[in-house]
Regions:
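Short loop/turn segments at beta-alpha junctions that line or gate ligand-sensing/allosteric surfaces
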Residues: 144
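Charged, low-complexity intrinsically disordered terminal segments
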Residues: 2-137, 147-158, 164-466
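Extended, Lys/Arg-enriched charged tracts that mediate electrostatic binding to polyanionic substrates
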Residues: 140
Length: 466
């Protein structure tokens, strides 16, 4: 009898421990953001003096990969690369091959990758280990998953930038994978946008500001350094394969020297915008900054975002933008074709609330899902980077946006967004739908017809972490 009772108590004990573990995991993954915090301060909306630098818009995915390889090849002393997602697929392997070649040329390489994605997709790759093992390369993972810090699992590094020799950089919304770079790796490619910036060489300006931000996030004690055994046979073989790959790439003649004067245009000012970089709940510093900038618009504001997932404070931000400008237009993926099922489901739930702010929404459908994050203010300012108009970007993740004062760049982007409106369906604040001249009604895939009604219910309790 005692043995039976003892066995029963052990089962209850294990069941209790398992229940505690499940509650711990679920509670950790659903830590709510500082959704009610919307404090204003001079620190949140005061911008540094803009620097007069040269810029180049990078829209095509093949062009985006080529620019990365050209920048890395041009480096003579230092490379800094930070990315949210890094896959060792075709384009990712090209980038690793270029970085290894740079390290072997005595260029110091520092690489910061979001920890969750690195643990899932990167650290087991022998090609990546070959780079990490090199004496001139240093790799850190931002806030990797730890059982003792599961409550911090939602705090991700969403930045994407590449800095060369403290004099030039590329920043935008693209991850380092075939989904965003190159041409032949996947049929599901997204469309996105980067900007290349060439500094003035003064040691100041936006290049220095971005480097300062990187040094802050690089030094966080929640990061973990990643090292590999460079003498392991499989790592040595991977390194040899990368050298062969790089030789083949450079042999095509596509990785050409950069002619900065011919390939860039002069901007009146370039400013790096960011919020808190620590792995914790964040005040919406960047959201407040973007709101203040949008309030300065007087004619037309265009917001490109893959998805719109707002709380009350973010709806208020849109209302404030509408209060200052004649027209505020959001371009987002049509729910029939958007690549993010969670974002599409939430948009269907929140469509009336979005329109009630006074904005109009263009539901865009194209050959590729849009992953672009851009804000155009009148005919002068363009803001490009990684910030989605959602609560995750506002309160949980690290994000970067680049404010560019350049009417020529703005005009090029306006031409692109005007064409997207021609291809889309525009919803006016009163709910009226206006089809563009080139609009073709998208077909809802069969799986979405069944999935979206379910997701619209399921996501409601935790939409702030989507």
């Amino acid at each position: 009898m005692k043995k039976l009772l003892s066995k029963k108590y052990r089962r209850l004990l294990w069941a209790g421990l398992l229940a505690c573990l499940v509650l711990y995991v679920l509670g950790s993954l659903l830590v709510p953001p500082l959704a009610g915090t919307q404090r204003k301060s001079d620190r949140q909306i005061k911008l540094p003096a803009p620097a007069a630098e040269r810029v180049c818009l990078v829209d095509g995915n093949e062009e985006a990969l080529r620019w990365r390889l050209r920048l890395i090849r041009s480096a003579q002393s230092e490379i800094v690369l930070s990315t949210f997602d890094f896959r060792i697929d075709e384009s990712g392997s090209d980038v690793v091959a270029a970085l290894l070649d740079a390290a072997e040329r005595d260029v110091q390489v520092r690489l910061l990758v979001d920890g969750m994605n690195a643990q899932l997709h990167l650290q087991g790759s022998t090609a990546f280990q070959a780079l990490a093992a090199h004496e001139n390369a240093e790799v850190r993972f931002y806030n990797p998953l730890r059982l003792t810090r599961l409550w911090s699992a939602n705090y991700r590094c969403h930045d994407k930038y590449l800095i060369i020799d403290r004099s030039a950089y590329l920043m935008g919304g693209r991850n380092t994978s075939d989904l965003f770079l190159g041409s032949g790796g996947t049929t599901r490619q997204n469309m996105d946008r980067d900007v290349v910036v060439c500094g003035s060489g003064s040691g100041r300006g936006s290049v220095a500001a971005l480097l300062g931000y990187f040094e802050d996030i690089w030094a966080l004690d929640t990061n973990r350094e990643f090292r590999a055994n460079g003498e392991a046979g499989r790592v040595l073989r991977a390194a040899a394969a990368l050298r062969e790959r790089w030789a083949a790439i450079t042999g095509t003649g596509q990785v050409t020297p950069i002619d900065w004067d011919a390939e860039t245009i002069q901007a009146g000012g370039v400013t790096v915008l960011h919020g808190d970089c620590a792995a914790r709940n964040k005040e919406p510093v960047l959201l407040n900054t973007l709101t203040a900038l949008m309030q300065g618009g007087r004619e037309r504001i265009v917001v490109q975002t893959p998805y719109i997932i707002c709380n009350r404070a973010m709806y208020d931000a849109l209302e404030k933008a509408v209060g200052g400008a004649a027209q505020v237009q959001i371009i987002t993926n049509a729910p029939q074709s958007g690549a993010n099922p969670w974002g599409c489901a939430d948009y269907l739930n929140q469509k009336k609330a979005i329109l009630s702010t006074g904005v109009s929404v263009c539901e865009w459908h194209g050959e590729r899902s849009m992953h672009t994050k851009t804000i155009l203010i009148d005919d002068r300012f363009s803001i490009i980077g990684s910030f989605n108009w959602d609560m995750r970007s506002a309160y949980l993740d690290t994000e970067l946006m680049l404010l560019v004062d350049c009417p020529e760049l703005n005009a090029a982007l306006r031409a692109e967004t005007d064409e997207m409106v021609r291809q889309g369906r525009l919803l006016l604040p009163d709910g009226t739908a206006v089809e563009g001249a080139a609009y073709t009604a998208p077909e809802m895939p069969l799986y979405k017809k069944f999935l979206q009604p379910v997701l619209r219910v399921v996501i409601r309790p935790f939409r702030y972490v989507l």
